[in-house]
């Protein structure tokens, strides 16, 4: 792991849980493939329901927010519509960013990592979005999320814009 994290040596695809070929199948030209998506509009998906996932900022790492459009039909595709990172925001600032996204999208579900300091962001978001879901991470919860992502990626049921390289 030292070589991967600090020496810029890549993990062998055979040793990775997410295979490169599977990940590449999830990459689409969102501007043309997603007919209901207008990225530069005030409301890029109009009234299409979306979910927000939020990992609050701790001390020096960035906070991360994703907007996901769940499938409209059984067995359909989950689309990662938007992703943002924030740095240097206090709890109020982080909650305001989430509220901004609630104005931009038809948000029907928000899940926040409320482990540790994330509790404060969760409490603030709950004031304007009472249905917010609190996630308290454990080894079991993380394993469950990775396995679900593996399943979606292996079956090409997750998509994101091919212009994203991070």
Stretches with model-predicted labels:
Residues 43-71:
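Gly/Thr-rich phosphate-binding beta-strand-loop-beta motif of the actin/hexokinase/Hsp70
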Residues 72-166:
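Mg2+-dependent endonuclease catalytic cores in nucleic-acid-processing enzymes, primarily RNase H-like
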Residues 2, 12-16, 62, 104-108, ...:
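Intrinsically disordered or highly flexible coil/loop and linker segments, enriched in small
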Residues 10, 27, 56-58, 87, ...:
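Short, flexible loop/turn elements at secondary-structure junctions
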Residues 41-44, 56-57, 101-102, 150:
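A general structural signal for short secondary-structure junctions and capping/turn motifs
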Residues 1-54:
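ATPase catalytic-site recognition across NTP-hydrolyzing enzymes
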């Amino acid at each position: 792991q030292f070589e991967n994290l600090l020496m810029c040596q890549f993990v062998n695809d055979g040793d990775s849980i997410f295979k490169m070929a599977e990940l590449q199948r999830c990459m689409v030209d969102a501007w043309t493939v997603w007919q209901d998506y207008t990225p530069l509009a005030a409301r890029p998906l109009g009234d299409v329901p979306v979910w927000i996932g939020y990992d609050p900022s701790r001390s020096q790492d960035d906070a991360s927010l994703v907007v996901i459009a769940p499938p409209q039909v059984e067995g359909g595709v989950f689309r990662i519509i938007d992703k943002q990172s924030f740095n240097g925001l206090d709890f109020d600032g982080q909650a305001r960013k989430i509220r901004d996204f609630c104005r931009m999208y038809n948000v029907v579900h928000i899940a926040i990592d409320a482990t540790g300091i994330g509790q404060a962001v969760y409490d603030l978001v709950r004031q304007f979005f009472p249905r917010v879901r609190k996630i308290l991470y454990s080894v079991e919860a993380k394993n469950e999320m990775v396995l679900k992502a593996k399943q979606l990626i292996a079956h090409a049921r997750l998509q994101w814009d091919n212009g994203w390289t991070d």
